[in-house]
From Swiss-Prot:
Keywords: Cell cycle, Cytoplasm, Nucleus. One of its GO terms (cellular component) is cytoplasm. This is Cyclin-D1-binding protein 1 homolog. It comes from Danio rerio (Zebrafish). The gene is ccndbp1. PANTHER family: CYCLIN D1-BINDING PROTEIN 1, CYCLIN-D1-BINDING PROTEIN 1. Its main location: cytoplasm. Belongs to the CCNDBP1 family. It is found in: Cytoplasm; Nucleus. Residues 191-215 are annotated as: Disordered. Gene3D superfamilies: I/LWEQ domain (1.20.1410.10), Talin, central domain (1.20.1420.10).
Length: 344
């Protein structure tokens, strides 16, 4: 048998492992949880899951060390190593699938993404090892090993219940909306039309202003000012909802947990709508797109506030801000639409 054939045979367990880990990763991304029956202990789940994650990290370290310098491990050692890694991966996947949706879809999504990230890191590590087996430890292999460690360590930071998972989603939404609003305000402050002092917006003579596609006109700025009110209402709605969830959210019943999921799903639609509106406000301003995006954002905010009002996180003291922001959304929507009608 040639040296090349011998090496290929020795690496066969790793190729099989690579395929198996890829399949496990895809199953985690796409698969459903097992049916829950009886009592489920979230505390026990986390204890067992953390042990499973630790085992994957340890096996990845052993795998990387085994292939950190020549010569190649023996066929037997490769096979044993593959079995150990495979066992740790199957254990991790099995434990993940224990988590039922009744504990919260948002929580489960967070655990799913973290689990898939560990498996993706392992796939990348195996890719590197298989592409250059028997060579000295490369920077690429070090980086891939570190990525597996980082993905495993990330489990310490992920939410441990659905309330925390929903708060994490809301915090991300608040940050994204805040960034979009600040970018728009900064662009307005920095953008000046160098011809604005000598040519007005109505100058459409041939050979006149050729820079209107890059600067806001006075009417554009007026429109943006009205739209800014809706953007601020978006940020305020998400901040107030975050506070209500932080102080009032309960996890005693499946209905309460499901209501939190509904809030997270509704909130997740706000940021993309804010981005679409903000982008349509950059020059050249497309007023038809602005109207479409304003209406879409207002509808998303109204739905979010309606879901908030009917959920258990809306205490008696919260009704006033929900009603105020609902009115603010409607008021800003009408102001923008009125301005667009007057411009047409």
């Amino acid at each position: 048998m040639s040296a090349e054939n011998s090496r290929s045979e020795a690496l066969l367990p790793l190729r099989n492992l690579w395929n198996s880990v890829k399949c496990s990763r895809d199953r985690v991304r796409d698969g459903e949880s097992n049916d829950s029956s009886g009592t489920f202990s979230l505390a026990n789940f986390w204890e067992i899951l953390n042990e499973a994650v630790k085992a994957v990290s340890q096996e990845a370290t052993k795998l990387s060390l085994m292939f950190s310098k020549p010569p190649l491990p023996s066929d037997e050692d490769c096979a044993k190593m593959g079995e150990c890694v495979q066992k740790s991966v199957l254990t991790l996947c099995t434990v993940y699938f224990w988590l039922p949706k009744s504990q919260g879809v948002t929580l489960r999504r967070s655990v799913r993404d973290a689990t898939a990230e560990v498996l993706e890191g392992l796939v990348q590590l195996l890719d590197v090892i298989l592409s250059s087996p028997g060579q000295s430890l490369s920077q690429e292999q070090l980086t891939s090993t570190g990525s597996v460690w980082a993905a495993c360590d990330h489990f310490d930071q992920i939410p441990k219940d659905n309330r925390s998972a929903v708060l994490a989603v809301l915090s991300s939404c608040v940050g994204l909306v805040k960034d979009a609003l600040e970018e728009m305000q900064q662009a307005l402050a920095e953008s000046q039309d160098p011809f604005g002092d000598v040519l007005d917006d109505d100058d459409d003579d041939e050979g006149g202003r050729g820079n209107q596609d890059r600067y806001w006109s006075a009417s554009d700025r007026q429109l943006i000012g009205q739209c800014e009110g809706l953007l601020k209402a978006s940020a305020a709605s998400l901040r107030k909802l975050s506070s209500a969830v932080r102080h009032n959210a309960q996890l005693e019943t499946e209905q309460e947990i499901a209501q939190l999921d509904d809030l997270a799903d509704a909130a997740a639609h706000v940021s993309p709508c804010v981005d679409d509106l903000a982008l349509s406000l950059y020059p050249p301003v497309d007023r038809a797109a602005v109207e479409q995006n304003v209406c879409r954002l207002a509808a998303v905010l109204k739905k979010l506030l309606d879901i908030t009002r009917s959920s258990h996180v809306c205490a008696e003291a919260d009704v006033s801000w929900v009603e105020f922001l609902s009115g603010a959304v409607e008021h800003n929507l009408e102001k923008v639409r009125s301005l667009l009608r007057s411009d047409s």
